[in-house]
Amino acid sequence: MKELVNILDFLPEELGEKIKPMFRVKQIYQWIYQKYANNFSDMSSLPKDLRLELARNFHFSPVKCVKNEQSKDGSIKYLFELIDGLRVESVLLPMKEEKIDAEGKRISHARYTICVSSQVGCKSGCSFCLTAKGGLKRNLSAGEIVGQILWIKKQNNIPYERRVNIVYMGMGEPLDNLKNVSKAVKILAQNEGLAISPRRQTISTSGLAKQIKELGQMNLGVLLAISLHAVNDELRTELMPINKAYNIAAIMDAVREFPIDQRKRVMFEYLLIDGINDKLEHAKELVKLLNGIKAKVNLILFNPHEGSLYKRPSLENAIKFQDLLSNKGVTCTIRESKGLDISAACGQLKERAKEQ
C-alpha cells in the first residue's frame, strides 16, 4: 500500500511542482487552512479527478488529539499522537483583551496564544525542565508543527483571520530543529493559509549561538526569546548543560547580530528558582549583562513538577527582582503561569505515556 505524504509539509511553491495549475494550489491551501476542510472530498471547488488524486497521494492529519485538559484559568493542554505513535503536548492560552471603540465603549474579546512543540522530547538537559527527563526521540516535521496549530484553531472554532500568537516554547529546542521550524514559520505566514505573520511568531532557544546566527541570516522576521535563567557561566552550566557548548558571552554576541524590528525587543526568559538565582545581586548582574541590548526580561516563577528538588520563590521576592531591573531601565514583566493546575505551564510538558 502506498504511503501517503503529509500535505501540511509543503509550501505553495513546492506543492505547485506536483499540482498544476498554480491557482489550484491556492484553492487547496484555502480549503485546508481557511475553510478547515476535514478531507479532500470536502473541497467542492476542485475538479473530482483532482480530489481523487489528492486522496491517493496525501493526507493532512499528521497529529491526532488523544486527550485534552482545561485549566481553571481557561488554558487547554492537548496531548497529540503522531503517526508513529510518539506523543507531544501543546497549549492554547486564551486571554481577554479590552479595547475602546470609536464611540468610546469598552469592548472585550479573546486573544489567543498557541504554544507548540518542535521535538518529541529534548536533548538540552535543563535541570528544571520535565521535557528533558526523557531525552530526545526525534524532530517534528514542519507539517507536524503546523498540524498542532491547525487542529487547535479548528477545534476551538477560531476563524483563520483571527490573529493568534505562536510561541515555539513547547517540547524541544526549536533551533535544534531549525530547518523544519523555519519552514513551519513560512507555511503559517502564507496569505492563502493561516496568514500568521512572522512578527506574531516567537522562537525560544536555550542559547544555541550558532543557530541563532543562522536564524538571523534567514531574515524571517520572527521574534527571538532566549532562555537565560542565570547571569554567570558556572550557575548556568549547572542549570543548563548546553552552556558548556555555548556560554553566555557567545549567546550575547549572537543576540547582538540578530536582526529585529525597531519596535521590538529580544525577550530574555529568566526562571526564578528559590535560593538559586533569585537574589538581588543576580538582578544587578543581569542589568550589566543586558547593557546595550534592546531587551525585555520575562520573569517566570519556577513551576514545580514531580521529581524536582527546586522550589518556587515567593511573589514578593519576584517583585523585588522586577523592581530592581525596572528602576535600572530594563523592561521587565512577571509572567502569569497559566495552566499550572494541569501541568501545562513552563517546564511541565512531556511525552505522556500511552496508557494515559
UniProtKB/Swiss-Prot annotation:
Primary location recorded for the protein, binned into one broad class: cytoplasm
Q: In terms of domain of life, where is this protein from?
A: Bacteria
What's its catalytic activity?
adenosine(2503) in 23S rRNA + 2 reduced [2Fe-2S]-[ferredoxin] + 2 S-adenosyl-L-methionine = 2-methyladenosine(2503) in 23S rRNA + 5'-deoxyadenosine + L-methionine + 2 oxidized [2Fe-2S]-[ferredoxin] + S-adenosyl-L-homocysteine; adenosine(37) in tRNA + 2 reduced [2Fe-2S]-[ferredoxin] + 2 S-adenosyl-L-methionine = 2-methyladenosine(37) in tRNA + 5'-deoxyadenosine + L-methionine + 2 oxidized [2Fe-2S]-[ferredoxin] + S-adenosyl-L-homocysteine
Active site, per annotation: E89 (proton acceptor), C346 (s-methylcysteine intermediate)
Location in the cell: Cytoplasm
Annotated EC: 2.1.1.192
The alphabetized list of GO BP terms reads: rRNA base methylation; tRNA methylation
List, alphabetically, the Pfam families matched. Radical_SAM (PF04055), RlmN_N (PF21016)
Q: Which residues form the Radical SAM core domain?
A: 108-341
State the GO CC annotations: cytoplasm
Residues annotated to bind S-adenosyl-L-methionine: G172, E173, S204, S227, L228, H229, N303
List all disulphide bridges recorded for this chain.
Answer: C115-C346
Cofactor comment: Binds 1 [4Fe-4S] cluster. The cluster is coordinated with 3 cysteines and an exchangeable S-adenosyl-L-methionine.
Needed cofactors: [4Fe-4S] cluster
Quote the record's binding site residues for [4Fe-4S] cluster: C122, C126, C129
Q: Which UniProt keywords apply?
A: 4Fe-4S, Cytoplasm, Disulfide bond, Iron, Iron-sulfur, Metal-binding, Methyltransferase, rRNA processing, S-adenosyl-L-methionine, Transferase, tRNA processing
InterPro entries registered for this protein in UniProt: Aldolase_TIM, Elp3/MiaA/NifB-like_rSAM, Methyltransferase_A, RlmN_N, RNA_MTrfase_RlmN, rRNA_lsu_MTrfase_RlmN/Cfr, rSAM
For this protein, what is any one GO molecular function term?
tRNA binding
Extra info from the record? Reaction proceeds by a ping-pong mechanism involving intermediate methylation of a conserved cysteine residue.
The family line of this record is:
Belongs to the radical SAM superfamily. RlmN family.
Q: What does this protein do?
A: Specifically methylates position 2 of adenine 2503 in 23S rRNA and position 2 of adenine 37 in tRNAs. m2A2503 modification seems to play a crucial role in the proofreading step occurring at the peptidyl transferase center and thus would serve to optimize ribosomal fidelity.
What is the name of the protein in this document?
Dual-specificity RNA methyltransferase RlmN
The organism named in the record is: Campylobacter jejuni subsp. jejuni serotype O:2 (strain ATCC 700819 / NCTC 11168)
